[in-house]
Amino acid sequence: MTQDCDALILGGGLNGPALALALAQAGLRVALVDALPEAVRADEAFDGRAYALALASQRLLKALGVWQRVAGLAQPILGVKASDGRVGQGPAPFFLQFDDGEIEEGPMGFMLEDRHLRRAFFDAMAAEPNITQVSGETVIAQTPDASGITVRLASGRTLSARLLIGCDGRRSGTAERAGIKRTGWGYGQTALVCAIAHEQPHNGIAQQFFTPGGPLAILPLPDNRSAIVWSEADATAKTISALDDEA
């Protein structure tokens, strides 16, 4: 049986495209199925989400040809400061601090907004002849056979491959259809995510406060902006989310 591709990846977040590029650059024919339409995945509208990328992650993106597309949009992390604290009372007087002078390779990491990284992955895959992107489609069935596996999409289209890879998140339909069991639990916390602009420079320092309700991270972005990740107990986070701008 002739396969449509060597590897079929389900999931278009970050892991799926990264793996697709790595396999394609190794000479394999890859198809990636993404439930989101192209216009949504490639949209660069501001949504407040950002990633802290370790130096190893930045090197991986560079090797895949993705970093070159976003290097000018990333904020180097030049230091990390961590302390205990309480919201409204500020940090404790004792803290841990690390700076990039302690490593030889360069910055400790980089902050990069999700909207830019998503678009960079999308464009890099579009430029790779060994990758076929199938957007706005969901898988409803997967059937293994002697030569590989065949999946059926909601549109009725079928795709076959030697290998099926699930990169479709923690509630993976790929894993569920394969009968792979997962164990999980909740922490009773919700993360509130946003970005702010401020007058004083952050100097590339990432701040982390460990509060009774959960950690509060203030992470540097370009142009005197910072990404906020505030974890609180579910009930408290729900109350905060319901507040209006005046509050």
Segments and roles (model prediction):
Residues 61, 150, 167-247:
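Conserved FAD-binding catalytic core of PHBH/FMO-like flavoproteins
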Residues 45-87:
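N-terminal FAD cofactor-binding segment of flavoenzymes
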Residues 15, 38, 171:
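Conserved Rossmann-like nucleotide-cofactor binding loop
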Residues 5-32:
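N-terminal Rossmann-like FAD-binding beta1-loop-alpha1 element of flavoenzymes
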Residues 11, 34, 81-84, 196:
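Short beta-strand/turn micro-motifs composed of small residues
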Residues 24-49:
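Glycine-rich FAD pyrophosphate-binding loop
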Residues 4, 73-177, 185-190, 245:
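Conserved N-terminal helical subregion
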